[in-house]
Design a protein with these regions (language model features):
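Intrinsically disordered, low-complexity polar/charged tails and linkers
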Residues: 1-165, 169-173, 177-207
Length: 207
């Protein structure tokens, strides 16, 4: 059973990947898209020679051309999913699109995008200057949010990718994680440290 985050965190998108054991030619898929695009509302792009991007049935697929120099299965990404059942349904829809029969295909979750809220106004400039944390990056000329990186004591594997953008409203955008337990632990750490810093800043903010 997949772990579910607390009500503080909402999964807004899942990027997953799967492999086709029966490869399909990109030109064939393009022809299928042309045949079905008006009827099924398919939108597709082939701007790079080895990548075909397709929007279909509420999902986005990125199909990679199989190399002629390898026997490995053909790789495909799927996004715009909110839960695991979305991924399963999306894969079956893709099999229909490429004219292959339904089958169970394993998938890997590569990345979650989540939203969260600390529930209060956060003076991010003061939090940054007060905390002096090595995990905080504040560049207001680039983005109006405090960037918070995941510390290695929460996830050694995701310390370079899992991050949170914290806005003054208290809203958070969390990306780069592939494990909901780690994302929950990361957000809990952010919440406790930022709120604690805000409490020490209360006299300054009120003066």
């Amino acid at each position: 059973m997949m772990f579910e985050c607390s009500r503080d965190i909402e999964v807004t998108n899942i990027k997953a990947s799967f492999k086709l054991d029966t490869p399909v030619d990109l030109e064939y898929v393009k022809n299928r898209c042309r045949q079905l695009e008006s009827k099924l509302g398919i939108v597709w792009y082939h701007t790079k020679p080895n990548i075909l991007t397709i929007r279909f049935s509420g999902h986005t697929y990125i199909l990679f051309k199989r190399s002629s120099h390898t026997e490995q299965a053909q790789h495909c990404n799927i996004t715009r999913c909110r839960c695991c059942s979305d991924i399963v349904i999306g894969i079956q829809n893709f099999l229909f699109l490429i004219d292959q029969p339904p089958k169970i295909i394993d998938y890997t979750i590569d990345n979650y995008s989540c939203s969260a809220n600390l529930g209060q106004f956060i003076p991010i400039d003061l939090v940054y200057s007060k905390s002096r944390s090595q995990y905080h990056i504040y560049q207001p000329e680039r983005i109006s949010a405090l960037e918070i990186r995941c510390p290695p004591f929460i996830s050694e594997d995701r310390k370079d990718s899992l991050c949170c953008l914290l806005y003054r409203s208290g809203k958070c955008s969390i990306v780069g994680g592939n494990n909901l337990l780690e994302i929950q632990a990361f957000f809990d750490w952010i919440k406790s440290t930022v709120i604690e810093t805000c409490q020490t800043l209360a006299p300054i903010c009120q003066s």
